[in-house]
Regions:
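A juxtamembrane structural motif centered on a specific transmembrane helix
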Residues: 2-10, 331-363
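N-terminal membrane topogenic signal
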Residues: 10-26
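Hydrophobic alpha-helical transmembrane segments of multi-pass inner membrane proteins, especially
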Residues: 24-31, 35, 39, 48-240, ...
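Short linear Ser/Thr-Pro motifs
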Residues: 39-42, 261, 352
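Glycine/serine-rich anion-binding loops at beta->alpha junctions
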Residues: 118-128, 170-172, 252-257, 346-358
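Transmembrane helix boundary and interhelical junction motifs in multipass membrane proteins
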Residues: 173-178, 256-261, 271-273, 286, ...
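TM-adjacent membrane-interface loops and short helices in multi-pass inner/ER membrane proteins
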Residues: 226, 230-273, 277, 287-288
Length: 363
């Protein structure tokens, strides 16, 4: 009898609707990411707290919490979220509005965090990314017949995004705005909106709007000028990008060796955050970077495959939304680190030190 129960339990485990390739890919990315956080953060952690494992231990704790939460969340039928898709929009607005309340705290010149206690803080924009995916998945399913039209399809549904983007720009948080806009555009095109409508709107409104946002904010304009020639201000705004390029260049084909980076010794500010990919390139070289990017490509491939095989449109859009979230962040982060686009403050999924952010992402 006990043997039959064990066999039934094992059979149930095998029949669990996990995509094992995806899960293994996530665990590999998490594992490599943790090793890189340990390596990249050790000098900063030692100088700040006297404990070279300070950042790593926190990242490890939250990664474990994320994996545990993932195992529980995976048991919930995704259709459950469809019932509450309208609430996701309101929760997003409330969370972003709370950043502007006394609960919000300014860090490095931007107000993006909610501090409940000294040890309990989080970035609402990280949660909002997922709430936007749920909201748009539900709304696009409901309005699927309107999507091929310009005003009822594109314009009407983009307008729902305006208050969210407006609140993000008040923080200011341009990188999160870019990611969310990118996710929504991908979801709407997959759902049935016409690409030519996006192209025309992007040329007529998107590009001029982005140019205005850069020109009207001095620090953004300075970042753009620095991007054009970082060596012009090598001791100022160009410092981080130039040091990143030094790290990537010195890595060569196979790297200088794990743990042997020189640029992490306070040359690159907070090397365990946005610029962790440059430390990866320095220590593990082109080969190490290629392995990581291939793993991200596998993640994206499995995400698209899940979207294609989803039993309904809502599931398909949820899958494509989450896949787009990771893909867009990877593309922007690597582009910034290699000086292919201006600095945006974009973190590398599964790698950058994020605490609660790593939990949200894994879940």
């Amino acid at each position: 009898m006990a043997k039959k129960k064990k066999e039934k339990s094992f059979s149930s485990f095998l029949n669990n609707p996990f995509d094992f390739t995806l899960v293994i890919t996530i665990l590999l990315l998490l594992g490599i990411g943790l090793v890189m956080v340990l390596s990249a953060s050790s000098p900063s952690a030692l100088s700040e707290s006297g404990n070279s494992y300070a950042y790593f231990s926190k990242q490890l704790l939250f990664a474990i919490l994320g994996i545990i939460a993932m195992s529980f969340i995976s048991k919930i039928d995704y259709r459950f979220y469809q019932k509450f898709y309208k609430h996701a929009w309101w929760i997003s607005i409330i969370l972003l509005a709370l950043v502007m309340s006394p609960l919000g705290k300014e860090v490095n010149g931007t107000k993006r965090w909610i501090y409940l206690t000294e040890t309990l803080s989080f970035q609402p924009s990280e949660i909002v990314k997922f709430l936007v995916i749920i909201f748009y998945a539900g709304m696009l399913v409901k309005d699927r017949d309107e999507l091929p039209f310009y005003w009822k399809g594109l314009v009407k549904h983009i307008l729902y995004l305006a208050p969210i983007i407006g609140l993000l720009l008040l923080e200011p948080h341009l990188s999160a705005s870019m990611v969310i806009i990118g996710i929504v555009c991908v979801m709407m095109i997959v759902a049935g909106c016409k690409f030519k409508h996006f192209a025309l709107t992007g040329l007529g409104v998107g590009i001029p709007g982005l140019a205005a946002l850069i020109a009207l904010e001095p620090y953004r304009l300075k970042r753009f000028v620095t991007f054009m020639d970082p060596w012009q201000d090598i001791k100022g705004d160009g410092w981080q990008v130039v040091q990143s390029l030094y790290a990537i260049g010195s890595g060569g084909l196979f790297g200088v060796g794990l743990g042997d980076s020189k640029q992490k010794y306070l040359y690159i500010p907070e090397p365990h955050n946005d610029f962790i990919f440059s430390i990866l390139a320095e220590e593990l070289g082109f080969v190490g970077c290629a392995v990581v990017l291939i793993l991200f490509a596998v993640f994206i491939w499995r995400g698209v495959l899940i979207a294609m095989k989803a039993p309904d449109m809502f599931g398909s859009l949820i899958a494509i939304g989450i896949t787009s979230l990771v893909a867009i962040q990877v593309i922007i982060n690597v582009a910034v680190v290699t000086s292919s686009m201006p600095a945006t403050g974009m973190q590398l999924p599964f790698f950058s030190y994020r605490r609660y952010g790593i939990v949200y992402l894994v879940v």
